[in-house]
Regions:
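Rossmann-like NAD(P)-binding element
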Residues: 145-160
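Residue-level detector of alpha-helix initiation sites
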Residues: 113-114, 159-160, 184
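Cytosolic regulatory regions of ion transport systems
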Residues: 160-161, 167
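Short gly/pro/ser/thr-enriched loop/turn and capping motifs at secondary-structure boundaries
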Residues: 138-140, 183-188, 211
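Active-site capping/gating segments
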Residues: 200-230
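ADP-ribose/adenylate-binding Rossmann-like module
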Residues: 168-192
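Segments forming oxygen-rich coordination pockets for charged ligands
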Residues: 1-136, 143-147, 227-235
Length: 235
């Protein structure tokens, strides 16, 4: 089977499912998986920025090229220029469709309250994919799944619960781990984790945030996210 560039008009049923208004003219590129280089899938799983160029003969896909940061210099000028913008974007040309996929930072906030809400609001403003999780069992799974592109922020006055969340973040690969709370809370968490044979806390920023004499929830959120941005940029 060959890939196709499809033109459809969204009907009422499709609008209900997709959220796209009824009557919208939409274009979809459908390409069989075997048209892609096998290395494409590991790159997408690892959330590596890539550019996909589907070459067209009218509406039929004739070839698919995939570029990453190491090979984008060999792409055509339009693809390289779109990739250089550093954001997910798409362009449709008569002879090809260019799809640039840039991963979005995931931010998991384990805790609740005004500070968590302020961090979530500012994180969303940054364009990050934000999850505020209050249930410990859900937080542990999310924290452990983070990548070096992502950030984890731990808060809470209950030592065992917040320590479990901190331990889960350390098990994952989050590029930034921030722990809110006093120095005493930081030590209490460190002691709890030590009983679990977790002693390397070098990746943890605690108390989290840069020193701007923050006091309000929004100021604290700015302080913490500024530190997170700086650390993620290093990665």
């Amino acid at each position: 089977p060959t890939g196709r560039l499809l033109n459809i008009q969204v009907n009422e049923f499709e609008a209900t499912i997709s959220g796209i208004p009824t009557g919208t003219n939409a274009q979809f590129l459908v390409v069989p998986a075997d048209h892609f280089d096998p290395d494409t899938w590991p790159a997408m799983i690892d959330r590596v920025p890539i550019a996909i160029v589907a070459h067209l003969d009218q509406d039929e896909v004739t070839r698919v090229d995939v570029f990453d940061e190491s090979s984008i210099s060999t792409a055509d000028a339009q693809t390289a220029e779109l990739f250089a913008e550093g954001a997910t974007a798409y362009e449709i040309h008569p002879d090809r469709v260019i799809s640039v996929l840039f991963p979005v930072t995931r931010l998991v906030v384990a805790g609740q309250g005004p500070i968590a809400d302020a961090i979530a609001d500012l994180g969303s403003t940054l364009g990050w994919n934000v999850s505020v999780v209050m249930r410990n069992d859900l937080a542990i799974g999310l924290l452990a799944s983070l990548s070096p592109l992502d950030a984890a922020i731990i808060m809470g006055h209950e030592v065992e619960m917040s320590s479990r969340n901190l331990g889960a973040a350390l098990e994952g690969n989050a590029g930034y781990i921030g722990a809110l709370g006093s120095m005493k809370m930081q030590q209490d968490r460190a002691d709890w984790l030590a009983y679990q044979d977790v002693t390397d806390l070098s990746r943890v920023f605690g108390p989290a945030g840069v020193d701007i004499s923050a006091s309000s929830p929004v100021e604290i959120a700015i302080s913490v996210l500024a530190q997170a941005i700086a650390e993620l940029k290093k990665n």
